């Protein structure tokens, strides 16, 4: 009522552990969904293992929100499978919390494994607008992805990101290295 809408498109659990420990809440969401107040329910997860545990316990959700970007493709296979079963796939972390725009030389040794990759992207794309366009177009090119969530700091960034959708990056092939989770999950990064 306070939102001034008749229904909400989707509600996602943003803490997989809470979702696993709250079968009553999951059941209540199902009841609310049946009334039509909420159209879709699902989960925002950090690892494929979390998603597998949730599906094992509660069955297929309507929506999953996952981190996905040029470097982080851990969810690609399971997303293809879920999409084929009718699950809506939303992604976040297209720019990996801004890591792609940071100067690799200023990064701590924690990121040693990806510094050459980040340097190569910076050299090939020349500026942050092209990097953003390449990364956004990469994610949007995946047929299993329905929605992409990105963060912007101002209207100029939003316009730049939208304009980058008109650029052709099909000839820009950049291989991403296989990296460990400690580089893909920002909560595992050093605090500085």
Which positions does each model-derived feature cover?
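Beta/alpha (TIM)-barrel catalytic core signal, keyed to glycine-rich beta->alpha loops juxtaposed to Asp/Glu
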Residues: 16-191
